[in-house]
Swiss-Prot record:
The lineage of its organism: Bacteria, Pseudomonadati, Pseudomonadota, Gammaproteobacteria, Pasteurellales. It comes from the Bacteria. The gene is glgB. Coiled coil: none annotated. Keywords: Carbohydrate metabolism, Glycogen biosynthesis, Glycogen metabolism, Glycosyltransferase, Transferase. Pathway: Glycan biosynthesis; glycogen biosynthesis. It is an enzyme of class 2 (transferase). It comes from Pasteurella multocida (strain Pm70). This is 1,4-alpha-glucan branching enzyme GlgB.
Length: 730
């Protein structure tokens, strides 16, 4: 005779509202012996099998015809391992009862999760393969502290939320269930009854794999193995090393020519890595890879932060892409978006009926520019979710750095908001103190756990201390995009050369603040979309002048202090704006389409990268005044600039730019060292489709004072061109 389970309790199970399944289901001690109860909708019979002896112990009584079974095993006081033989009509199967297993969330994990200080919560939350009592399966865990009931649903249970309600850990707000026999590749979601009694179907925030849009389920996937940081990769990230970054959108770098569909990760690796290596870039930066629902966001509105997008294949494929880059000596950086997330119903929004991940007040929690939600950085569990994600990509995929998107929108409460549309911080200020602490903590965590990895900030304001260590009060980034330099110099280059003399300071102002941060000079995807034109399209003049302007600008940029970043397509001067739905215009490199104009720019970028890597004077002292000296800074009338770059061991290269279409012959300016100067680069070379004005290989200094220096050189500066002169000594 079974112990009475009230009809109301049984009804709660079939209505999907029972919040504590382990208090009823599984094995329980009663006065008459051990009682076993099972919830198996649509089953006709259930027999208990002893796992050790494989003998039938008893048949469960069909207490409720909808599928609730129970039986007492008389005179038995000791719990034992068992299986259930379940009959579905004439057919039967042996299953492991999920409700016979004890809680598996360790006390330490539970405590760390409860205070939001777990270093790697992705190792605990989500779906993880494990073995318990000799039974293999998947342990599912979800943080949803305000939900009334959570069930795991998926391919393994007909997506029926009645079948597998989960155990609730009150202290941490985590729901848990070990599901035997769940297997790799099966799809799943969490079914919640939220705090308002509404049913919600949510993807796993910690899923390691997700379905391709428009489908939204998570996919059971193994946690990737850790990839140790190597000394070679660590060295390539250092401040005194050459860093030239090729920014890539995987969905449009190159596509299948027959159907315009994406290449997969392995196909991309086979084509992209050799190309980047040949072009001389030291790093690749991928636009966001975390799973995202809307192609048009380019990945900047992610929902599956722990899932490499399935657009291009599997997580294993993405990992192979990174491995191939490392084999070629190329480091890999990932765009990372911890600033906001879309409001799709299967995602993080109103997760358990409350504003769990976001702010409840739209003045704090809604981003009006992007129609997205803003993370609540004041909540420990949310900070933990995000900072752990940074570690996940760096440790588990062997990435060498992250570039953090839209930092300014995170650290200012009034970002893009009018008066009255934002809430001041506790001191009445506009800074988002919680976001600032989150960034400091994340960068500290990266430095502590993945030594040698770098973080780069896209920060568009003059916020102080972005690249100052967090231990010294800064945000702790290693580099910052120099948005001011980019905006000023592009504004200058877009002007007709006749008017450039009136805007001369736009090319020099960057040196006023050059040593305030560690800078990357970015010509990114943002500059070639939304009607801004391509870089080539920004340049004034006829076709010859457009290409010459761009070549001169690249020469100036590669000589200027700061690491380099160039978005794909700009290395061969694509003429139209970037379109994420199509491949780059590679056909422009063919004679019949682009002539040799585009080949010339491509060859120049290749040579710039190799010269840059080969000469320490162009990178070693980017962050020190000892590495830079203006030689000609005030020649507005001729739009000429000249500066010297220096290395620690005394190597010197002079960079000279002429931003008018008039060649400047016999142009004299002072130099610091007497001797010969070899012309190692000329953007006007015929090799690059220029007019081939130059200095016949080298020039020598003369004891003729100029520009407050005792020695000077007299050079020919080609029209719309930059030349590099390397000091060779006397």
């Amino acid at each position: 005779m079974v112990q009475l389970v009230s009809p109301s309790v049984i009804n709660q199970f079939f209505e999907g509202t029972h919040a504590d399944p382990f208090s009823v289901l599984g094995m329980h001690e009663t006065e008459k012996g051990i009682e076993i109860r099972a919830l198996l909708p649509d089953a006709s019979r259930v027999v208990v099998i002893d796992r050790e002896t494989h003998n039938a112990v008893c048949e469960l009584e069909h207490v409720d015809e909808r599928g609730f079974f129970a039986a007492v095993i008389p005179k038995t006081r000791t719990f034992f391992a068992y299986q259930l033989q379940v009959f579905w009509g004439a057919e039967s199967q042996f299953i492991e009862d999920p409700y016979r297993f004890h809680p598996m969330l360790a006390d330490l994990d539970n405590w760390l999760l409860s205070e939001g200080s777990h270093l790697r919560p992705y190792e605990v939350l989500g779906a993880h393969f494990m073995e318990c009592d000799g039974v293999s399966g998947v342990n599912f865990r979800l943080w949803a502290p305000n939900a009334k009931r959570v069930s795991i649903v998926g391919d393994f249970n007909y997506w029926d939320g009645r079948r597998h309600p989960m155990r609730f850990h009150q202290k941490s707000g985590v729901w848990e269930l070990f599901l035997p026999k769940a297997s790799l590749g099966q799809l799943y979601k969490f079914e919640l009854i939220d705090c308002h009694g509404q049913l919600r179907l949510k993807a796993d925030p910690y899923a390691f794999s997700s379905q391709l849009r428009p489908d939204t389920a998570s996919q059971i996937s193994a946690l990737p193995e850790i990839v140790p940081m190597t000394e070679q990769r660590r060295k390539a990230n250092q401040f005194d090393q050459p860093i030239s970054i090729y920014e890539v959108h995987l969905g449009s770098w190159r596509r299948n020519l027959e159907n315009n569909f994406w290449l997969d990760y392995d196909q991309i690796a086979d084509e992209l890595i050799p190309y980047v290596k040949e072009m001389g870039f030291t790093h690749i930066e991928f636009l966001p890879i975390s799973e995202f629902p809307f192609d048009g966001s380019w990945g900047y509105q992610p929902l599956g932060l722990y899932s490499p997008t399935s657009r291009f294949g599997t997580a294993e494929g993405f990992k192979r892409l990174i491995e191939k880059a490392h084999q070629a000596g190329i480091n890999v950086i990932l765009d990372w978006v911890p600033g906001h997330f879309p409001s799709d119903t299967h995602g993080l929004a109103a997760f358990d009926g409350t504003a769990l991940y976001e702010h409840a007040d739209p003045r704090e929690g809604y981003h009006q520019d992007w129609n997205t939600l803003i993370y609540n950085y004041g909540r420990n569990e949310v900070r933990n979710f995000l900072s752990s994600n940074a570690l996940y990509w760096l440790e588990r995929f062997g990435l060498d750095g992250i570039r953090v998107d839209a930092v300014a929108s995170m650290i200012y409460r009034d970002y893009s908001r009018a008066e009255g549309e934002w809430i001041p911080n506790q001191y009445g200020g506009r800074e988002n103190l919680e976001a600032i602490e989150f960034l400091k903590h994340t960068n500290w965590k990266i430095d502590s756990e993945v030594q040698g990895a770098i973080s780069i900030a896209e920060e568009s304001t003059s916020f102080a201390g972005v690249t100052k260590p967090s231990t010294e009060g800064g945000l702790g980034f290693h580099f910052k995009w120099n948005m001011g330099w980019m905006n000023d110099t592009l504004s200058y280059m877009q002007k007709d050369p006749v008017y450039r003399q009136y805007h001369h300071d736009q090319m020099t102002f960057g040196m006023v603040y050059q040593y305030s941060e560690n800078f990357v000079l970015p010509l990114s995807h943002d500059e070639v979309v939304h009607g801004k034109c391509s870089l080539l399209g920004k340049m004034p003049g006829d076709a010859w002048q457009k290409f010459a302007n761009l070549r001169a600008y690249y020469g100036y940029m590669w000589g200027y202090p700061g690491k380099k970043l160039l978005f794909m397509g700009n290395e061969f001067a694509q003429g139209r704006e970037w379109n994420y739905q199509e491949s780059l215009d590679w056909f422009l490199l063919e004679e019949e389409h682009g002539g040799r104009w585009h080949q010339g720019v491509q060859l120049l970028v290749k040579d710039l990268n190799h010269i840059y890597q080969q000469h320490a004077s162009l990178f070693e002292l980017d962050g020190s005044p000892e590495g830079f000296d203006w030689l000609v800074v005030d020649d507005r009338q001729n739009s000429v600039f000249a500066f010297e770059r220096r290395s620690k061991d005394g190597e010197r290269i002079i960079v000279v730019s002429n931003f008018t279409p008039v060649p400047r012959h016999d142009y004299r300016f002072g130099v610091n060292m007497a001797g010969n100067y070899v012309e190692i680069l000329n953007t006007d070379s015929a090799f690059y489709q220029g007019s081939n004005v130059g200095n016949y290989g080298e020039v020598g200094s003369e004891a003729i004072p100029s520009h407050a220096r005792a020695q000077s050189i007299c050079v020919s500066i080609p029209p719309l061109a930059t030349i590099y002169l390397k000091y060779q000594g006397e």
